[in-house]
UniProtKB/Swiss-Prot annotation:
Name the record gives this protein: Nuclear distribution protein nudF
Lineage: Eukaryota, Fungi, Dikarya, Ascomycota, Pezizomycotina
Annotated gene: nudF
CDD domains assigned to the protein according to its UniProt record, in alphabetical order: WD40
Family to which the UniProt record says this protein belongs: Belongs to the WD repeat LIS1/nudF family.
Polar residues bias spans: 422-436
Length: 467
């Protein structure tokens, strides 16, 4: 003991032990220790009172420190792994290539204002506006660049479950859906006035997405919206009239998530029946089903064409599908804690294991090389499709509670002007799953990836991760 502690430390330890023994009524043990220590320790009632509880505090402090050390060691190992997987070029590159950018802690902004869990987020396709929905029944509009609240949108009477920007070109709308069985359309250009309410579902509306131009060959496809519901159906709406133009039935339980293909021809939907379905909108029939998940499916994502070369290698194809094709590869996330990658024929390509709780949202990197996921384990994970889907980054402190949603800011298209100079027209790129509009083939275009993601959580906060 003398080799480890100074004389003063040893004396304090002895006093703490004596005080502890006295506090738990081990008087004989306390007296025996005092007698054995003799005059080396002077202790009276006041000293006993002073040192009472000190030993327990020291003990719990040690336990807390051990946990912090373990957390730091885990974080250090993750950073070392990230460093090992980085190339010398990427380490030296000051302005990182946006096609390989990945989010990292800390978040640029933490947006606070909701009074209940945040359930959904969506980026405006042009401006620096972000919409978030919550169990508190409100939608909040933020300036994600400044980290400031712009307005609170009220109208739903129960939890807001999903939001999405889209609609006709030049007339962007915000759609929201809720446990109150309705879908609402809001006009951002008119102070987010509620311009239409779409009733029709018989239960909670879980997900809503605008369908990109070209859906089913319809000239009015830019006006189409798809919704998924606990009533087991998908509904297609014309936002200009408010009419439901098609109902897709086939799921046998709650449909929780839906994603349209970039050309609007297909829909991927999944939910409590654990069977994702790829729907052909022109025929309103299921094209493929995907079997493998062992629990409720919370989220789905359709891979962009930029991911085809990497996913083709994983699936064993000699060459990737043409970039002009859509709905070739998919990702699904489940309460079974796994992410599964599929091809359009329903074949399982890869199972991604790493999350310790329900997987809640997915987003393919617009650059095509990565897939991002969030889960109830409070983490964001980045999977590298070029490295057998290795998890190359974990943001373990993404939120203080379950992470419920994730969205990537849609890329922008820059159209070449008459003089050949690129001019940003504010059109979301064709690689975006939000209001994806195909660029004019007669005009030179350049896709500009925005390195920004947003996440929401049960901790009632929205976090912005950006360059």
């Amino acid at each position: 003991m003398s080799q480890l502690l100074t004389a003063r430390q040893a004396e304090e330890l002895h006093k703490s032990i004596i005080a502890y023994l006295a506090s738990v009524n081990l008087t004989e043990s306390s007296a025996a220790l005092r007698a054995e220590l003799g005059d080396s320790v002077s202790i009276d009632d006041a000293t006993l009172k002073k040192y009472e509880g000190l030993l327990e505090k020291k003990w719990t402090s040690v336990v807390r420190l051990q946990k912090k050390i373990m957390d730091l060691e885990s974080r250090c190992a993750a950073l070392q792994s990230e460093l090992d997987s980085a190339t010398p070029t990427s380490l030296l590159r000051k302005n990182q290539d946006p096609t390989s950018w990945l989010p990292r802690s800390p978040a640029r902004h933490i947006l606070e204002g909701h009074r209940n869990p945040v359930t959904c987020v969506a980026f405006h396709p042009v401006f620096s506006s972000l919409a978030s929905g919550s169990d508190d029944t409100t939608i909040k509009i933020w300036d994600w660049e400044l980290g400031e609240l712009e307005r609170t949108v009220k109208g739903h009477t129960k939890a807001v479950l999903d939001v999405d920007y889209g609609g006709p070109r030049g007339g962007t709308l915000l759609a929201s859906c809720s446990s109150d069985l309705t879908i609402k359309l809001w006009d951002p250009s008119d102070n987010y006035k509620n311009i239409r309410t779409l009733p029709g579902h018989d239960h909670s509306v879980s997900s809503v997405r605008f369908i990109p131009s070209g859906a089913a060959g319809s000239p009015m496809s830019g006006n189409l919206l798809v919704s998924a519901s606990r009533d087991k159906t998908l509904r297609i709406w014309d936002v200009t009239t408010g009419y439901c133009v098609k109902t897709l039935s086939g799921h046998v339980d709650w449909v929780r998530a839906v994603a349209p293909s970039i050309d609007g021809r297909f829909l991927l939907a999944a939910g409590d029946d654990r069977i994702p379905r790829l729907w052909d909108l022109s025929s309103a029939e299921t094209k493929s089903t995907f079997l493998g998940h062992e629990h409720v499916i919370e989220c789905v994502a359709i891979a962009p064409a930029a991911s085809y070369p990497h996913l083709a290698v994983l699936s064993g194809l000699k060459k990737p599908p043409p970039a002009s094709s859509s709905a070739e590869f998919f990702a699904t996330g489940s309460r079974d804690k796994t992410i599964r990658l599929w091809d359009s024929r329903g074949n399982l390509i890869k199972t991604l294991v790493g999350h310790d709780n329900w997987v809640r949202a997915l987003a393919f990197h617009p650059g095509g090389k990565h897939l991002l996921s969030v889960a109830d384990d409070k983490t964001i994970r980045c999977w590298d499709l070029t490295q057998e889907c290795k998890c190359v980054r974990v943001i373990s402190d993404a939120h203080g509670h379950f992470v419920t949603c994730l969205r990537w800011a849609p890329p922008l298209i820059k159209d070449g002007g008459a003089n050949g100079e690129a001019e940003t027209n504010g059109t979301p790129a064709a690689t975006s799953t939000t209001n994806g509009v195909r660029p004019d083939p007669n005009v030179a275009t350049k896709i500009s990836i925005r390195c920004v993601i947003a996440t929401g959580s049960v901790d009632q906060k929205v976090r912005i991760f950006a360059t």
